[in-house]
Amino acid sequence: MTSVINVNLPTQSYEIAIAPASLDQIGQSLAGLKLGKKVLLVSNPTIFKHFGKVAVDSLEAAGFQVASYSLPAGERYKTLNSIQKLYDIALENRLERSSTMVALGGGVIGDMTGFAAATWLRGINVVQVPTTLLAMVDSAIGGKTGVNHPHGKNLIGAFHQPRFVLIDPQVLKTLPVREFRAGMAEVIKYGVIWDAELFNQLEQSKRLDQLRYIKPELVDAILTRSCQAKADVVGKDEKEGGLRAILNYGHTVGHAVESLTNYRLLKHGEAVGIGMVAAGQIAVNLELWQQADADRQNALIEKAGLPTKLPVGLDIEGIIEALQLDKKVKDGKVRFVLPTQIGVVTVTDEVTSDHIRQVLQQM
């Protein structure tokens, strides 16, 4: 079953195609976009081994001249040094303004390829072909690109929308279990912030911790409803002037935890799971949310095999200090996304360090 979701933007609208066994059709998909002939396919070694040949063959069969380059996997490689390597390859292959970078991989590859495309020759085409659940439902959509700074996540970046997003659910079969669980954090997030029906469907599933235990129709719903939620929010607020900030639910504390553990201890989705538990409890303590709903959220996070406690030995004061570097800080105040009911959230700067400390000490 193929689903097409439109991301409608004032500048450049595009399609998200969710189609099983579609990776070998990528050349045809791109041929219809009237792009230049030169393509740089960026991946990581593991993903390229699984899917690189299929993608390259398809692109070449459609008449594209394809160069490929693999960057190391992992958040700690999401740096300007890696971007420099992509610039070198772009120069070597004489990429032009009409050329395209194709990101074949998870969130890290997508973010870096998008940023390289945004900045090479002041902006060339990028196409996202996400291979992890997290990238499929979140990072490949919406045009946020960037790299990490030693003192904070995604502090260096640009908004650069893709020309097209191709999601082939069958590639999830090769995804390690821990990566699948990390992606489920973003899916649960959409249920809490936007889509109560998705939340209910997740509650009805006996297990959420491994792809093979989830019914195919729920996998379809997870992908289509999550992508639709992201497309709806981005379509209303492309550059995070207001509404789009809700997509950062769980990310405020989550990013601080990732940064303090040097991006080595936790997957992004695991940190987001911890961040959602923290944000949910802050909302309860501020009497914005019912404890029963927070418990329902936490039960889903646990059912997805995600952590709900802070890593042992993490300095709580360090987390509170790191929050000041969050991108959502406005006039020196940390802005938190907090739920008010399942499917509805609010953004507030009324959360004090004491509120945060009180919750984190219980985690």
From Swiss-Prot:
Keywords: Amino-acid biosynthesis, Aromatic amino acid biosynthesis, Cobalt, Cytoplasm, Lyase, Metal-binding, NAD, Nucleotide-binding, Zinc. This is 3-dehydroquinate synthase. Belongs to the sugar phosphate cyclases superfamily. Dehydroquinate synthase family. Binds 1 divalent metal cation per subunit. Can use either Co(2+) or Zn(2+). Pathway: Metabolic intermediate biosynthesis; chorismate biosynthesis; chorismate from D-erythrose 4-phosphate and phosphoenolpyruvate: step 2/7. It catalyses: 7-phospho-2-dehydro-3-deoxy-D-arabino-heptonate = 3-dehydroquinate + phosphate. One of its GO terms (molecular function) is 3-dehydroquinate synthase activity.
